Amino acid sequence: MSKLSKATEFSTKERLKIKERDGGCIFCKMQYHTEECKDIYLLKPNQIMHYIPRSHQGLGIARNGAWGCIWHHTMLDNGNQGRREGMLSMFREYLKKHYRDWDESSLVYKKYDF
């Protein structure tokens, strides 16, 4: 596994931190478009979502992740119905609430630190 792949993957330790912090899907807790979901199974929180995605070298750390259900994770990743920007704003505010010194620039993998 490359250093980049390892750095962007959520470890078991980070996953546990996120699950303990969130206690469920952050968007379900805000009741964000849950009424539109036709399959209750999709609302089961079982995935870790990146704020800055792996495709943009987002780190696999608690400050860059939240617990989510399949419904909301898919909605966030695919930008369904033009909701991605709004969801990212909610996600950002949620993370800022938990980490006073939260900074997006610290969430991205840097091969060279200069």
Give each language-model segment a name.
Residues 1-9:
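Short Lys/Arg-rich cationic patches that frequently serve as NLS/NoLS or arginine-rich RNA/DNA-binding motifs
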Residues 8-47, 69-71:
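Short cysteine-rich loop/turn motifs with clustered Cys
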Residues 37-40, 55-66, 74-114:
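Polybasic, low-complexity binding patches
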Residues 49-51:
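Catalytic histidine site
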